[in-house]
Amino acid sequence: MTEPPKICQETPPIAIWGGFLLMCLGMFMAILDIQVVATSLPTIQGALHISPEAMSWIQTAYLIAEVIAIPLTGLFTRVLGLRWLFAAAVSLFTLASIGCAFSGSLSTLLVFRVVQGFSGGVVIPAVFSAVFLLFPPRLHAIATTIGGAVAVLAPTIGPVVGGFITETWSWPWLFLINVIPGLIVAVLTPRLVPRQPTDLAELIKLDSLALLLMVLALAGLEIGLKQAPHQGWLSPACAGQLLASGLGIGIFVLRTLRSAHPIVRLAALQQRSFAVGCALSFCLGVGLYGSVYLMPVFLSFVRRHDAFEIGTIMLVTGTAQLLAAPFAAILESRFGARALTAAGFALFALGLGLSSFQPRTADSAEMFWPQVLRGVAIMFCLLPPTRIALGALPEKEIADASALFNLMRNFGGAIGIALIDTILYGRVAIHADDFRARLLAGDLNAAQAIGLDPSLLANRPAGPPTAEEIAFVRPMVEKASLALCVNEAWAMLAGVAILGLLLALLAREQRN
């Protein structure tokens, strides 16, 4: 085991800043990859002749591997040190990207997606660990702002990047764009980031049973959340799987708390600030990933925009995030984290809530200000909670705590998307039946709501609708019903943001 000099210095050299920026680039690659692939799944499906049911596993395989890797980041950091862990993870991610690009079958693609997800899952918490390991407290706000801006910008611009690549080039380039930046990050990061203690003996003391429990429980939970909206949350198969996953996580936690050499150090959860910070990270995950998922649903299926147009409209959120980032850094270094977090979630709830009133005909103009509010708010929902969660922890707990903090954001996203799908799949038919009944009763307001000229309904002869009339009205009813469900989903996300506001009040005030 090597004993390097203390990393965190009062005046970090330029090399450390360069290394940190390269780490942020690696994190940007990993997060962006999820979104660009999600945007282009139909293209990959057609190229590899994959069924629609199997297509979703291209994303699910990545997400399962990622959620397993995130809590292991602390262990990997203790074994390899920060710089070599990051270099190894980015190298593996780059090689897996090449493998994905040249995959000729679904099975081959899934194998490389698992490798991508596992290596990418290590990268994200490692960056937030670096904020507190490489820099003194007075620079935490600036470093957190840089890392946070990158983390939330990537999902926002992902759709436009994915749409541009699939329309301009071909689907393998969704993965090949990672190669050059991946090589740069893998080669230069270990040269710029200082040494840390390493302890290969951690692998010898590894609790293999706890590791198996964690892998099975997290994978089962991710799959259960994916299937719940389709099969029903209370269906025997889905409910059983979610219950088994929850039981597995409970047993893992009990075993880990009693272990002399835990895989994941959970001691930080005993501190109120860290526990509240994790809850805030969960709420942000619901709103952040939920909104990035929900906007394309509306713009694609209701407004009929293509992938590139959707990405262009969503750039408003990313632009607002970038413009808000320096102000967030200034305020974050001068004011208490609790007050800024509460303000951020209040603004986030407002931006989400405004979208819940958008009409069926809403487009880029109507979506502009809600996007601006959300983009500004997201920076204050990420940066101050990071300081609340990690700012007061001892250095030896940072890596594991950062992993748990980021894991909660990912879980929030998974649960948020599952709840959105539950609303969309479960409520569309209800609204459609209501529209049909109102139209048959001659309700002119219903005609106007679905975009049908009320005079056509008013002047229609009495009697049951003809096949031609049903065919003409059906797509209007479907779009209007989906638009109502989207608004209900926005309202649900706003409710979670309000919960984040209330949780922020429980945090202990911290100032730099």
Description of each model-found segment:
Residues 1-12:
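Short, Lys/Arg-rich, polar N-terminal cytosolic tail immediately upstream
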Residues 14-86, 97, 107-110, 150, ...:
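Transmembrane core module of solute transporters
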Residues 39, 63, 70-210, 236:
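Helix-loop-helix hairpins in multi-pass membrane proteins, especially solute transporters
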Residues 54, 388, 409-508:
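Hydrophobic transmembrane architecture of multi-pass small-molecule transporters
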Residues 54, 139-146, 309, 397-404, ...:
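Cytoplasmic loop-to-transmembrane helix junctions
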Residues 98-102, 186-191, 250-254, 353-357, ...:
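Membrane-embedded alpha-helical segments of multi-pass transporters/permeases
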Residues 146-159, 367-451:
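Small-residue-rich alpha-helical segments with characteristic i,i+4
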Residues 179-197, 216-226, 245-258, 503-508:
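C-terminal membrane-cytosol helix-exit motif in multi-pass small-molecule transporters
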